[in-house]
Amino acid sequence: MNPLLTLILLASLCAGCVHTYTAKSISRSGVLRTNATALVSLPEDGRFENIVYPGSGRKTALAVSKAFAKQLRTVDVTPQAGALSQHLEQARAGRFDYLIVPTVVHWEDRATEWSGRPDRIEIEIRAVDVPSEKTLSLGSVAGKSKWATFGGDVPEDLLDLPLGMYIDWLFAPDGTPLPQPRAEPEQTMTRPTGKGR
């Protein structure tokens, strides 16, 4: 076989053996405070084409709250989805400093083990200062599963790594570049955690 063709085939096979992630900042006006509190709004369930994935909104909110809880003093989640104005009222009533608004942009759960089509997920995260109602940051994270799998993968498994890196970065000093998650066979990348920044 042609050596070049062999290399191309091997590279394409290796690419299918890893999850891939991205984290993107759209806007950021300052550093979030670690001694603050936050309310995470429950987003609407994700969908792909005409398929709605029940419970995906709650899974997203829990993943976002878990990541913010590593940095903030207190984090809670709203009991149901609703309008931004409604969630701001709840945040004010609960004396929260920040309202975190995740939105499920894309949620695609595939039987990858036999279809070869990967799971995909994209979440937008907005951080709002409750007293001023000003948006402090807006960004998104995304993940695509490996296609070489024996099954059991679900889209929410792709959230922890890029979410953690993006949310940790919101507490980093101004000028700190947003790190990009590397493609990993499994979600084993370690990253700095804790509230000492």
Task: Give the location of each predicted region.
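Generic short beta-strand segments
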Residues: P43-D45, T103-E108, A142
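Second-shell loop/turn segments in exported
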Residues: G46-G55, E113, A148-D153
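A structural "domain/chain start" motif
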Residues: G16-L72, F171-R197
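Short beta-strand->alpha-helix linker/helix-N-cap micro-motif
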Residues: S65-E89
